Amino acid sequence: MTTSTLTQSSDLISDTPRTSKIPMSQKVAFGIGMLANQMFPAALGIFMVILVESLGMSPLMWGLIFFLPKLVDALTDPLMGYISDRTESRWGKRRPFVFIGAVVAGLSYIAMWQLYEDNGITYNFWYFLGWSIVFFLGMTIFSVPYVAMGYEMSDDYHERTRLMAVAQWIGQWAWVIAPWGWVVLYDPEWFASATEGARTVSIYVGLICMLLAMVPAIFCDSEDTSSAEPKSGGKTLAQTFVELFKGIGITLKNKPFQRICTATFFIFNAYNCVAGFAFFIIVYYMNNGDPVAAGNWPALFG
């Protein structure tokens, strides 16, 4: 990496106030955002069972609904980071995107689950896939600047570590709370069908997570970058994209980064494989295909 590249990278991360000590109130505000960042995918994974169990979608459709939005997400994440790094506004370069992404993700999550059996499998597939892509675009707009915001809140390595520890502790509660959605959705005393439950519960999940995701945008400090020198340097859009992909190429050549990516790939795939099958194993192997008879077991294993 050249000296000029290092200088540009340093300039990009110097727009926000960097102090050694982060107040606990700021850590908690940032951590509440992490709860939303983890609750959205946690709740989505719980609700996704309904597509197969209640709406009759094939495993192929289910797989495509998982795969295609995440493919879009993988392509847009680095682009979002590039845009955020070069944003000048009175609210800083992260907070506007965190706020907008929270709104898009919350509202699209609600829309995504307004499914009806009468519409047919094909219609529900395309309807859900479309809104799912919008949802993951909203999550990209929210999560990429949000995570970057955390690394810019202090210039002290240990303080950033403490910030992330607080945030992760708060965020992990999403995976404790979300599995109970299975119990609520399939309890006949709550809803006549799981699909009806999803339509109703998604409204609460979407609105609550949207409000939680807004907290860092409102309460975490940032610096006015509206008068900052533009980072594009007068480059055209095409030149900007070329620079973006050159930067990605340089990053991918970094051996430690490759190891981290490889480990992350296997860890997340292992976890998601087990998590994806847990509900079906408990319902079909232990309870003869009756989700009502499964009771609290899916939540306890989740």
What are these model-derived regions, one by one?
Residues 2-302:
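Membrane-embedded alpha-helical bundles of multi-pass transporters/translocases
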